[in-house]
Amino acid sequence: FIPEHGDFVAKSEKLLRAYLWSAFFTNRYENSAASRAFADYNVLKEKKKKKDFSDDNWDIVPIFNRDEYPLSNTDSLAEAGWPKSVGIEERGVLAVASYFGAYDFADNRQATFESIQHREYHHLFPDALLKEIEVKSLYAMNCSLITWKTNRVIGRKDPIEYLKERVEL
């Protein structure tokens, strides 16, 4: 429901981008996701019918009410679990990490909608290595999406050693 021409396009895209990131980084959809998303959709749809809508009244859309649904803070993001789980915030962290293309470490291929279906979750700092020093590894900040082939080549290698190998090639 984005128009094709005019300033309204930019305003609509800005609103929808803010909505998407808010969906990832607030707890609005942790419970009753379908009914809350539908409620937000209805308000967004009504708001966009008025071509002169402004940023000033975004908080009429429930997800933008920062008193009720504040954005995640840095501590919360640092503690976000493994993105393969069901959590919205975890997947949001991975979405941010992938925002600029999610290039594979080895073949430098950019993730696309098609290729990402075949990528694997990879620990930047290997699970086994972190377990040896009794550090939890299943955090979104320790995750990337890479090809299966790259994942097998990297294996349990120390990240510094792997990066040195990549640079020497």
Regions found by a protein language model. Give the residues of each.
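Polyanionic (Asp/Glu-rich) segments that form extended negatively charged tracts
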Residues: F1-I2
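Short secondary-structure subsegments characteristic of cysteine-rich extracellular domains
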Residues: G6-F24
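Non-catalytic, well-ordered alpha-helical scaffold segments
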Residues: E13-K14, A18, R91-L94, M141-S144
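Residues that form generic nucleotide/phosphate-binding pockets
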Residues: Y19, K47, E165-R166
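Hydrophobic alpha-helical segments
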Residues: A23-T26, D127, T150-V153, K157
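Intrinsically disordered, low-complexity N-proximal targeting/linker segments that flank membranes
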Residues: F24-Y121, L129
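Histidine-centered nuclease catalytic patch
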Residues: A111-N142, D158-P159
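Short Cys/His-centered divalent metal-binding micro-motifs
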Residues: Y139-E168
